[in-house]
UniProtKB/Swiss-Prot annotation:
Enzyme class: transferase
InterPro entries in alphabetical order: Aminotransferase_I/II_large, AON_synthase_class-II, AONS_Archaea/Proteobacteria, AONS_Proteobacteria, PyrdxlP-dep_Trfase, PyrdxlP-dep_Trfase_major, PyrdxlP-dep_Trfase_small
Family statement: Belongs to the class-II pyridoxal-phosphate-dependent aminotransferase family. BioF subfamily.
Biological function: Catalyzes the decarboxylative condensation of pimeloyl-[acyl-carrier protein] and L-alanine to produce 8-amino-7-oxononanoate (AON), [acyl-carrier protein], and carbon dioxide.
Domain of life of the native organism: Bacteria
Species assigned in the record: Nitrosospira multiformis (strain ATCC 25196 / NCIMB 11849 / C 71)
Protein name: 8-amino-7-oxononanoate synthase
Length: 396
């Protein structure tokens, strides 16, 4: 986002001043360079760290069966799609995965996208435009917000989980088409949206409901089928977006919906039409990933156990975990500098937990986003808890 660049002159010195300003406000972002696969223990710059910052919730990103399936897919399909899905880039592997995803999520059709960001952009811009209305939770993922702005529909945002305000907005809207957009599991808070109530409002006010289940797919519901299965709800109004690089362990995203919605996306979603298809070997590997997700009840049970343990370990701290029953456990410090200080203190102890600051989260809510994986052990969580308590004492 370039909002805070508005007052900066279009010169190299202007950009340097902007970057200095970000550093002064404890908002500068840095990248880590991993030298190992994703796992509870990773190597960065030659040092091993215990990591709590990946979205690899089921520990599949380095699973031997997925690695074998990926190699098998590369042998069968090569390493690149070569062109877009609508030219000659749509392979049998893509097609089989779309059919499997539709069946797994209990929708008539599914459509692959390269990323969740592109999937959300494709859906919102294909289905809405000038004269239409989009309604979104203020804590939605940036991709949903950007998609709504790109569509040129009127965007109304409601306070987090404030369905009374959403209902007033829906009731007052004269738009010909209405679309409610929401995270199913909020990526920085870890809480789950009240999907039955959201759906009821969409039914009452004749709106579509786009759910971004990037952090629920594979984790929630029977066999990991996601947030809809968690609540046991379905409706032709629902447009379901799931990602394939988090719990699924590989890469990509998909949209599942009614036949007419999917066909409209194929015809009109620019982020689907005007891009090269993902390598087909990824889709081949993801077919195996779906099998592992469906059979991963033990992994999901372990996640629940680790989540309960982490809450116990963090209970004595001055900082509080936000209420969340998902693997996303945010420990809120408030000030940017303090979140960075605690993150760095953990790093000195060989533990990686990312500090999340504005604009990713609202001002005054900087936090550590602790992310659990079923690959973590009980001892890993206890080590993190002990380190946090020691840092807490040292900062008194």
């Amino acid at each position: 986002m370039l909002n805070d660049l508005d007052s900066i002159h279009q010169t190299d010195e202007g950009l340097r001043e902007y970057l200095r300003s970000r550093g002064n406000r404890s908002l500068y972002r840095y990248r880590l360079t991993l030298e190992s696969p994703q796992a509870p223990r990773i190597t960065v710059s030659g040092r091993e760290y215990l990591a709590f910052c990946s979205n690899d919730y089921l520990g599949l990103a380095n699973h031997p069966e997925l690695i074998a399936a990926l190699c098998e897919g590369a042998t069968q399909y090569g390493v690149g799609a070569g062109t877009s899905h609508l030219v000659s880039g749509h392979s049998r592997a893509h097609h089989l995965l779309e059919e499997a995803l539709a069946s797994f999520t209990r929708f008539p059709r599914a459509l692959l996208f390269s990323t969740g960001y592109m999937a959300n952009a494709g859906v919102v811009t294909a289905l809405t435009g000038r004269g239409d209305a989009v309604f979104g939770d203020k804590l939605n993922h940036a991709s949903l917000n950007d998609a709504a702005l790109l569509s040129r529909a009127r965007l109304s945002r409601y306070p987090h989980l404030d369905l009374a305000t959403l209902e007033r907005q829906l009731a007052a809207s004269p738009a010909r088409r209405k679309l409610v957009i929401s995270d199913a599991v909020f990526s920085m808070d870890g809480d789950i949206a009240p999907l039955p109530e959201l759906l009821e409002l969409c039914e009452r006010y004749d709106a579509w409901l786009l759910l971004d289940d990037a952090h629920g797919f594979g984790v929630l519901g029977n066999q990991g089928r996601g947030s809809l299965a968690h609540f046991n709800i379905s409706s032709p109004r629902i447009i379901y977006m799931g990602t394939l690089g988090k719990a699924a362990g590989v890469f990509g995203a998909f949209v599942a919906a009614q036949e007419e919605i999917i066909e409209t996306l194929i015809q009109c979603a620019r982020s689907y039409i005007y891009t090269t298809a993902t390598p087909p070997f990824l889709s081949h590997a993801l077919l195996k990933s779906l099998e592992l997700i469906a059979g991963g009840a033990g992994r999901r049970e372990k996640l629940a156990q680790l989540t309960k343990l982490l809450k116990q370990e963090c209970h004595p701290l001055r900082w509080q975990l936000l209420p969340s029953d998902t693997p996303i456990q945010p420990l809120v410090m408030g000030e940017n500098a303090e979140a960075l200080q605690v993150s760095e203190a953990l790093r000195q102890k060989g533990i990686l937990v990312t500090a999340i600051r504005p604009p990713t989260v609202p001002e005054g809510t900087a936090r550590l986003r602790i992310s659990l994986s079923s690959s973590h052990d009980i001892e890993d969580v206890m080590e993190l808890g002990a380190a946090l308590r020691e840092i807490d004492r040292d900062m008194e």
